Amino acid sequence: RNGNSDLLCNEFMRGAAEAGHQVEKIFLKDKHINYCTGCSVCSMYGKPCPQKDDAAEVVEKMIAADVIVMATPVYFYTMSAQMKTLIDRCCARYLEIKNKEFYFIIAAAEESVPMMERTIDGFRGSSTAWKSPKNAAPFMAWMPGKWAR
């Protein structure tokens, strides 16, 4: 909380709220989301994921949303483990995450646009599994006043 990705997310939310949109921020670190175990209950049998954690609640909100903003700091050249874990857990309902407009907010400690682009590539790769995604230009920042789109 209160890190660069959080501050950037706050600004995005402020603009969306001022434009009349309903917004909600979810801190993945406050959620209990287990790793996908590859049990195939969802993919082979079409049943809900058997894990009892907060993933179903977050994925349900993603399905209901028109716009999804995924914000993450860059940890060791990619998105945070919490973000990747959530994306993996979307597997059970990925066909329902359709026609969404995605925004990606990336914050890094060093000025390396190629490093941040690798993180964006991870998001874009995941979002191609979802039906008809509309990926907006990413927002990347590193030091105060230093950013790129």
Task: Describe these PLM feature segments.
Residues 6-10, 116-121:
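Short, surface-exposed alpha-helical segments at coil->helix boundaries
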Residues 93-99, 130:
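Short, conserved loop/helix-junction motifs that constitute active-site signature segments
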Residues 67-71, 103-108:
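Short glycine-rich or small-residue beta-strand-to-loop segments that form or flank ligand, phosphate
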Residues 1-2, 74-77, 109-113, 143-147:
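Short histidine/acidic/glycine/proline-rich micro-motifs that form metal-
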Residues 13, 18, 121, 127-149:
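Glycine-rich phosphate/pyrophosphate-binding loop and the adjoining helix
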Residues 1-71, 75-93, 134:
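N-terminal beta1-alpha1-beta2 submodule of the flavodoxin-like/Rossmannoid cofactor-binding fold
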Residues 28, 106-109, 141:
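Cofactor-binding loop segments of dinucleotide-utilizing enzymes, especially the Rossmann-like FAD-
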